[in-house]
Design a protein with these regions (language model features):
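Outer membrane beta-barrel transmembrane domains
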Residues: 43-45, 52, 211-313
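Short sequence motifs at beta-strands and strand-loop junctions characteristic
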Residues: 58-63, 116-123, 142, 177-181, ...
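Surface-exposed strand-loop-strand hairpins of Gram-negative outer-membrane beta-barrel proteins
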Residues: 37-65, 166, 173
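Transmembrane beta-strands of outer-membrane beta-barrel pores
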Residues: 34-40, 84-90, 133, 154-160, ...
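Outer-membrane pore/translocation modules
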Residues: 89-203, 208-215, 313
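Short loop/turn motifs that connect adjacent beta-strands in outer-membrane beta-barrel proteins
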Residues: 18-27, 77, 135-147, 195, ...
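Residue-level detector of the transmembrane beta-barrel scaffold of outer-membrane proteins
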Residues: 29-33, 79-81, 128, 149-151, ...
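Hydrophobic, lipid-facing positions within transmembrane beta-strands of outer-membrane proteins
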Residues: 28-30, 64-68, 123-129, 148, ...
């Protein structure tokens, strides 16, 4: 499976979801977010699968994240964001694949009777601090406004990592934690004209080696989203559509590049944020429209994100 940047970093766009278009900008907040990602495929070629009478749909991976996130303004132009997920990853295969491969070491899930493995636990914490480089606000509410924020971050190894020196490289990508400190850099630019606007985000993560000599590949995410503001009394709705692009270099294990790792994917994003006084509800659906993966990997079928947050001074 291609290990791209953690989705919980980007679902919030490292600025309390859609920073710059939400009415809670420059206010402290805390919230919960749920992510669901569905994959299909395995580290076998199409020819190998065909020989066994199988296809990639006989193999699945489901990733779920339950994320607690917060943002805090210690001073006017500095925003600190923190994110801590609980991760539940499940991979498995159909009975047909289990019989064809002679798998006996997988557990049997009694609900769907598919061989599976489960990896769960607290994930790695992410801390990011962004500084407001500029904020040009039009005196006319119907005019043009824009701003730029940028700053560093760090991914802290708080997550569970259940591997050993003999583990296969692909097992690291399923773990809740990576076991290494990974520096980051983040940038966001927001522009608005009347009730319409756009946002451009970019985040870079540098992979570092853990004690098992595994290092995730360096990763970058760039996304562009357009939105429109709609108001009814105390309610505010921001529907949005955009494109998310993610790219990752190959992982490194014992100083060797991992063949079935890294690559790039592009997602179509459709979402909406609903605000009522101090509360915000978000939902988004992301569908892959382009992929270029190295080797043989499970492919993402879709991503679903929902969340609820509360704002306070």
């Amino acid at each position: 499976m291609v290990l791209l940047l953690p989705s919980y970093i980007f679902a919030c766009d490292f600025c309390n979801c859609y920073v710059g278009l939400n009415p809670h900008y420059k206010k402290n907040s805390i919230g919960f977010r749920y992510h669901y990602m569905a994959y299909s495929g395995t580290e076998m070629s199409a020819a190998e699968l065909k020989e066994l009478g199988l296809n990639k749909k006989d193999f699945f991976e489901n990733e779920m994240e339950y994320e607690l996130h917060a943002q805090y303004y210690p001073v006017q132009k500095l925003q600190i964001m923190a994110s801590l997920p609980y991760i539940y990853n499940r991979d498995g295969m159909s009975n047909k694949a289990k019989a064809a491969l002679g798998i006996t070491h997988h557990d049997m899930h009694q609900e769907d009777m598919k061989a599976e493995n489960v990896y769960e636990g607290i994930g790695d914490m992410t801390l990011i601090g962004v500084y407001q480089v500029f904020n040009k606000i039009s005196m006319d509410s119907a005019g043009f406004s824009h701003r730029l924020l940028a700053g560093p971050g760090i991914k802290i190894p708080t997550g569970k990592l259940s591997v050993n020196e003999m583990s296969e490289a692909h097992l690291f990508t399923h773990q809740p934690g990576m076991g290494s400190w990974n520096p980051m850099a983040a940038m966001t630019y927001i522009a608005r004209y009347q009730k319409a606007g756009a946002r451009l985000n970019a985040v870079y993560l540098a992979g570092t080696e853990n004690k098992f000599e595994f290092a995730p590949g360096n990763k970058v995410n760039v996304n562009f989203t357009g939105y429109y503001e709609m108001k009814w009394s105390k309610w505010q709705l921001y529907p949005s559509v955009g494109v998310y692009w993610e790219s990752a270099a190959k992982d490194i294990y014992y100083s060797e590049k991992v063949a079935n790792s890294g690559g790039s994917m592009t997602y179509l994003h459709i979402g909406s944020d609903l605000y009522y006084q101090k509360f915000a509800l978000e939902a988004a659906f992301q569908l892959p429209v382009q992929k270029q993966l190295n080797g043989y990997q499970a492919e993402n079928n879709f991503r679903l994100i929902t969340g609820l947050s509360y704002t306070f001074n």
